[in-house]
Design a protein with these regions (language model features):
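Membrane-interface helix-boundary motifs at transmembrane edges
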Residues: 88-96, 164-172, 246-252, 329-334
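Hydrophobic cores of alpha-helical transmembrane segments in multi-pass integral membrane proteins
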Residues: 17-48, 61-90, 95-117, 131-152, ...
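Interfacial loop-to-transmembrane junctions
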Residues: 126, 163, 167-168, 251-254, ...
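Membrane-interfacial, low-structure loops and terminal tails that flank and connect transmembrane helices
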Residues: 1-17, 153-175, 309-337
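Juxtamembrane "helix-exit" motif on the non-cytosolic side of transmembrane helices
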Residues: 114-124, 271-280, 362
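Perimembrane loop-to-helix junctions flanking transmembrane segments
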Residues: 46-61, 205-217, 364-373
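Membrane-interfacial segments
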Residues: 90, 155-156, 246-247, 308-311, ...
């Protein structure tokens, strides 16, 4: 096989290669789109990009472009999570190959056709290909849910397993992966329901632009619920995958898995409930968030001491000093950084978002709309 053939085989058949390809596409897209940002516009870079690439940007269509851009960014992210799941959770090999192939074709089609439709003229063919790409990603999710079915006795755990399981042997971590997958499919369908009405009375909106609109339409509420739950489920999936990386097990694992399952289900119900039960939906979402946050906290409680212990054992140190323990904790920046990010992100993003939602009328609605909009956009990003 030629050198190019070997590289292509690596990029499109191995987990590392597939992830690298998705990250590269996302990075190139981010680099391109950053030239259209506010600061770049002030320096004249935006106009250069538009002229050189022949972009067709109409200000009245900005919201639609942003929606397509968000989806073009998130499809590779979803694909990366799928790759990690098929590589780290036991499923049949042929299922893994089929799922990875489908989601790869889907996200690549969605990204390039979506950006083409949004920024380079509104070709109906590109719009159709965008929908085909999204549909393929959705179909890959359906296959993943089937492959992850946790009540398949082939994947039951023994009674003495250190991993969370029921008395009958059902692997609760596998249940958590399956629940998140099914919830993601349902939440994607919620967004698709709103998207299906484009051109039939539904106009594109950005959630941050209608936060103080006293009466929101059913489809606008569906968009708000869709964007919140999709981000939340991506976060929970990342937590579950980190648990696999750290070989999360034992007492804290048995506590965390039920909480993550309950949190995922509760948050999903709450976000879907925004459509019909707006007055109580936030309370349901808060409850689910607390369960999920507790599960993530237990991973940190397990992971940090495990990092210290593993490195001290490698260095054959029995009675470590405080400095040696800190060195052991920080020695692997990737693993420490992943755990630290859980703490940092929750204090600076999740808790801030919940606090804002609880105090909307009391505090934040007294602020100028511009300030509230900035806070919301920062929280979501």
């Amino acid at each position: 096989m030629s050198a190019i053939g070997q590289r292509l085989k690596y990029l499109f058949t191995s987990t590392n290669g597939l992830v690298l390809t998705a990250v590269a596409i996302t990075g190139l897209l981010a680099a391109l789109m950053s030239t259209l940002s506010g600061p770049m516009a002030e320096w004249g870079v935006r106009e250069i990009t538009i002229k050189v690439l022949g972009m067709k940007l109409v200000e009245a269509e900005r919201e639609g472009r942003v929606v397509l851009l968000y989806h073009s960014f998130f499809m590779p992210v979803v694909a990366i999570l799928v790759y990690f799941i098929t590589a780290n959770v036991s499923i049949k090999e042929n299922w893994g190959i089929f799922i990875n192939s489908t989601v790869t074709v889907g996200y690549i089609t969605a990204v390039f056709s979506g950006i083409g439709f949004a920024y380079f003229g509104h070709s109906p063919a590109l719009h159709g290909l965008m929908l085909v790409g999204l549909s393929l990603v959705f179909f890959a999710g359906v296959m993943l849910a089937v492959a992850l079915w946790p009540w398949n006795k082939e994947y039951y755990l023994s009674s003495d397993s250190p991993y969370a399981h029921t008395r009958g042997g059902v692997d609760l971590e596998r249940v958590a992966f399956w629940v998140v997958t099914v919830a993601t499919l349902g939440s994607a369908a919620l967004g698709a329901w709103a998207g299906a009405y484009y051109g039939s009375g539904f106009e594109t909106v950005l959630a941050e632009d209608i936060v103080r609109q006293p009466i929101k339409t059913t489809l606008e509420l569906a968009v708000i619920g869709h964007l919140h739950i999709m981000l939340s489920l991506i976060g929970i999936t990342a937590i579950l995958l980190l648990g696999r990386w750290f070989d999360f097990q034992g007492f804290w694992h048995r506590l965390a898995m039920p909480l993550l399952i309950i949190g995922s289900i509760t948050m999903t119900i709450g976000c879907w409930g925004v459509v019909s039960f707006q007055s109580i939906a936030h309370i349901i979402i808060y409850t689910g968030s607390l369960f999920a946050l507790a599960g993530a906290l237990f991973l940190v409680i397990f992971g940090m001491p495990a990092l210290v212990k593993d490195h001290l054992n490698q260095w054959k140190i029995n009675n470590a000093t405080a400095g040696q323990k800190i060195k052991a904790l920080l020695y692997d920046p990737l693993k420490f950084g992943a755990l630290w990010q859980i703490i940092f992100m929750n204090f600076t993003t999740t808790f801030v978002g919940i606090f804002m939602a609880i105090n909307l009328d009391k505090i934040f609605r007294a602020w100028p709309l511009r300030e509230e909009r900035i806070e919301l956009a920062g929280h979501w990003h």
